[in-house]
Amino acid sequence: LVGSEMCIRDSYYRTDALMLSGETAYGKYPVEAVKTMTKVAAQAEKDKLPDNDIRIPLDENSNDVTAFLAKQAVKATTKLKIRAIITDSYSGRTARNLAAFRGKYPVLAICYKEKTMRHLALSYGVEAIYMPELANGQEYYFAALRRLLQEGRLQPTDMVGYLSSGKAGTQTSFLEINVVEDALKHANESVLPNCNRYL
């Protein structure tokens, strides 16, 4: 029971993932134990209390642009009507940075690699989605928006934050905030030919 009590407490402190102890999992009622912990975790997600947040300060001397932008994106969800934060991801680093700040709305990580998608499955608040890379980075973002709309993860009137880099293979360098339908309305004007990213 002690392991289960710890899982419950950890749920309220917004842990990334839960793992039942061997004793619980191999006990008389392993399926019931998993079902119960699933219910508890789901309820804990609904009952989020700001007091349970563990503050993650940024070092004043840090030059970590990704962490800075991730924190600002999560902060923006408390000031604006942002319903999701989208990031495209090779390694999952930006999505994990976003998860660290424990935002209220989901992080939709559009992953270039299936392996990255699997790794992000354990990150708090991250919904990892695999989508093969396109030649044009801007078109990748617009294709992701269309897919998220089609799957019902976003609505046309939703405001979203988007974190990405200006150049493939470099760290996150910008945060863009748009209403989905407005971004898509101007997609054809925004996509530059032979452009890997925005720069």
Enumerate the language-model features and the residues they cover:
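Nucleotide-binding motor/catalytic cores of P-loop/tubulin-like NTPases across gene-expression machines
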Residues: 94-96, 102-140
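Glycine-rich phosphate-binding active-site loops on the catalytic face of alpha/beta enzymes
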Residues: 9-30
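Short, small-residue-biased leader/transition segments that mark boundaries at the very start
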Residues: 1-8
